[in-house]
Amino acid sequence: MSENCGPTDAHADHDDSHGGMGCAEVIAEVWTLLDGECTPETRERLRRHLEACPGCLRHYGLEERIKALIGTKCRGDRAPEGLRERLRLEIRRTTIIRGGP
């Protein structure tokens, strides 16, 4: 396994697997980990992968900083009701697509 594997490197299309997960799968699940929305099993698999994959760990760190920045800049602001409703609908639609029939 390359020390530099991860989503931003030339071989990001490989399914580099650390901790039982490929880089693409880890990148797709980063926000569920940051938001505390993944299962304990998925959290452990993500943790193992991030410990072994510097590229994905860098990506995780970037997303973590973005989340913190958004949290500090948007504190107390409330989205307009129309936007909130559109987001709710999109989340439901995405959940249905990911969850399947």
UniProtKB/Swiss-Prot annotation:
InterPro entries: Anit_sigma_mycothiol_RsrA, Znf_put. One of its GO terms (molecular function) is metal ion binding. The modification Phosphothreonine is found at residue 94. Phosphorylated, probably by PknB. Phosphorylation decreases interaction with SigH, leading to increased SigH-mediated transcription. Its cofactor is iron-sulfur cluster. GO terms for biological process: response to heat; response to oxidative stress. Binds 1 iron-sulfur cluster per subunit. As the iron-sulfur cluster is unstable, it is not clear from the contradictory experimental evidence whether it is 2Fe-2S, 4Fe-4S or something intermediate. Nor is it clear which other residues besides Cys-53 and Cys-56 are involved in metal binding. Keywords: Iron, Iron-sulfur, Metal-binding, Phosphoprotein, Stress response, Transcription, Transcription regulation. Induction: By SigH, part of the sigH-rshA operon. It comes from the Bacteria. Iron-sulfur cluster binds at residues 23, 49, 53, 56. Residues 9-15, 28-34, 38-44 are annotated as: Inhibits SigH sigma factor activity. NCBIfam families: antisig_RsrA (TIGR03988). Interacts (affinity=15 nM) 1:1 with cognate sigma factor SigH under reducing conditions; the complex is disrupted under oxiding conditions or as temperatures rise. Binding inhibits the interaction of SigH with the RNA polymerase catalytic core. An redox-regulated anti-sigma factor for extracytoplasmic function (ECF) sigma factor SigH. ECF sigma factors are held in an inactive form by a cognate anti-sigma factor. RshA and some peptides derived from it inhibit the sigma factor activity of SigH. Probably releases SigH during oxidative stress. Belongs to the zinc-associated anti-sigma factor (ZAS) superfamily. This is Anti-sigma factor RshA. The lineage of its organism: Bacteria, Bacillati, Actinomycetota, Actinomycetes, Mycobacteriales.
